[in-house]
Amino acid sequence: MIIIPDCSVRSRPHSRTVLVTVAATALAAGCLLAALCLGQPSVGPAAALAAVTDPEHPLRVAVVEVRLPRALLGLVAGAGLGVAGLLLQDALRNPIAGPELLGVSSGATVVVAAIVVLGLGVPLALQPWLALGGALLAGALVLLAIGRTRDPAHVVLVGAAMSAACGGLVVAVVGLGTQGNVVVLFRYLLGSLAARGWPHLETVAPIVGAGLAGAWLLRRRIEALTLGDEVAAGLGVPVVRTRVAAVGLAALLAAAVAAACGPIAFVALLAPHLARRATGTTSTRRVLPLVAVAGGLLLVAADLAARRLLYPVEMPVGIATTLVGVPALLLLRRRRQPRPAVTG
Amino acid sequence: MTPSARAVAVVAGGLLAGLALVLAHLLTGRSDLPAGEVVRALVGRSEHPAYEVIVLDYRLPRVLVGLGAGALLAVSGVLVQAVVRNPLAEPATTGVGAGAALAVTGTLVLWPGHPLVYPAALLGALATGAVLYVVGRRSFAVAGVLLGAVLAAVTSLLLVVDSAPIGVVLRWLVGSLNARTPVDWAQLWPWLVVVLPVAWLLASRLNVWALGEPAAIGLGLRAGPFLAVVLLVAVAAAAAAIAAAGAVAFVGLVAPHVGRLLVGADHRLLVPVSAVLGAVLLSLADLAAFSVSVQLPGLATDVSGVPVGAVTALLGAPVLISLVRRESRR
C-alpha cells in the first residue's frame, strides 16, 4: 500500500467533512422519504412506512412497486454519476470533466437507442454492458483527442463534437425506425427515472456498487494524480495505469446509469464541486463518500421536483438537472477562478 | 504550387463540382425524368407542367439551399474557430442551433401550423448569439456549449408539455434538406450575398488576431469591437444556414479543416476555399442521403429519406478522429 501524506490543498479539520457527509446523508434520507410520500395519492410519512412494512397495505403497490424502486434508483444512479464525475475531474485534473461533456454518456445513449428503436431484444441485464462498449469507445476517442491538455475549452469542444456525432447517430438510428418511433426516441434522448422498476435497480445497483468500490480502492492514487504527474510518479503511483483505471471506472458508472435512465446531465459535474465547496477540501479520498451521497441527493431531489413542479405533466429529470446544473456550475466556477485576460 | 495558386485551383474545382452536383440533383429523384425533359423544364419550355414543378420547385431549390447553407456553415466555422482559436470549434459550439430549435419549438407550441417558423429560427439563433457575447467573454467555447445545453433542456421541456411538434423539431436539430421550396432559397441567398463578402473583408484582421491577443492589440486591433463583429458575422451565417436547413453537424468543422490542409491558415484564402468546400460537402452528403435506400433485416420498410444531418454526422465522426489525432500529436 502506498502511503501518501495528507495532500489537501486547503486542509481543514476532518470533522467538517464528516459533519457535512452525515448532514447530506440525513437530507438524502429525508428526500427518499418524501419521494415515498408524494404522488397520487400523497400520504404522510407514517402511512408510507406502514406500506413498506405491511404487505396487505392498500398503498403497497404505489409505494413499494412504483415509488420505492424509482427513488432508490435515483440514489444509486446519482451516487454513480457523482463518483464518475469526481474520478474524471481528479484523474484528468480538469474541473469541467464529466461524463456528459466527455461524450461518455452520449456514446452509451447511441447503443441504448439502437437497442430500443431497432427492437433488438437484448435482455435488460446485458444492456449496461453493451452501453458500456459505446461509452468506452466514445470516451477513449475523446481522451485521445484531449491528450495532455488541461484547457477546459479544448475538452469541452472535443466532447461537444463527440456528442454531436453520437446525436447524429442516434437520429440516424431513429430514422431507420418507423414514424411512431420518433416519440419513443425523444424519450431516450432525455434522462428520466419515470417507469423504472425493481429490474432496472437490480441491473444497475451491482455495477454502481462495484464502481464505487473500485473508486474507494483507488482513492489515494487518484488523489496523488491531482498533485501533478511528476509528483504522483515520485510518490510511486503508476500514473498512466491509474488514470486509465479511473477513466474506465467512470465510463462504467456512466454507462450503467445511461443504460437504465438515459443521459442525465450535470449531476456528475456538479456533485464533486458541491462537495469540495461544502467541505473546503479538494482531497479525493475525503470527499469521495460525500460526493456519492451528494450525487444521490441531487438526483432524488431533482426527480422529486421534476415529478411535482408541472404536475400533472412530468418533467424528465434530465431536463431539471440541466436547468439547475448549468447555472450552479457557472456560479461555483466563477467564484473560484480569477478572470483571465485572454479570450479563447 | 503556392497556397494562393492552390486556392484558385480549389475554388475553380469546387465551382465545377458544384455545377456537377446541381446537374446530379436535377437528374435524380423519386420520378424518373429524362435529361432532355429536365433541360426543357429548366428553361421553361417543357410540355408537361408537372415536370416544371418537379425540376423548378422541388429539385432546384433543394440543391441550391444545400450549396448555400453549406457555404454559410463553413464560413461560420472558420470565424468561430478563429475567435476561439481552436480548430475543433464549429457553429454549433456557439449554441445558436439550440437557440433556433428553441424558438422554432416555442412558435410551433404557441401557434401550431403557423408559417412563422423561418423568422423564429433566425431570431432565435441571433438572440442566442447576442446572449453568448454578453455572458461568454471569458470562454466562448465553454459558455456556448453550456448555453446550448440549457436551451436544449428548455426545448425538451416544451416538447414534454406538448409533443405535437417533435417530428419537425427533431429534423431541425439534425438538419434536413427534404422538401425545400423556392421560398427557402429566396430567404437564403441574400444572406450569402451579404455575409460571404463581409467575412472575406475580415480575413486579414483574422490573420492578425491569430497571432494572439497581446500581439493583435499591439498591432492596432481593437479586440472588443473586432470580436463583436466577427461573432456577429459568424452567428448571422450560422443562423441563416440553420434557418434554411437545420443544424447540420460537422460541415462547419470539416470544411475549414480540409481547407486548412489545402491552403494553410491564411484566412484570405481560407474563407473562400472553405465556403466552396462546405457547399460541395453538404450538397454531396445530401445527394447520398437522398439516394440511400437499403433494406435492413428486422425492419418492415426500406430505409430512405434519411435527413442529411445524419449522413454528415456519420461522415464527420472519422474526420473528427483524424483531427483529434493531429491535435494530440501537436
Tell what function each PLM region has.
Chain A
Residues 1-344:
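Alpha-helical transmembrane segments in inner-membrane proteins
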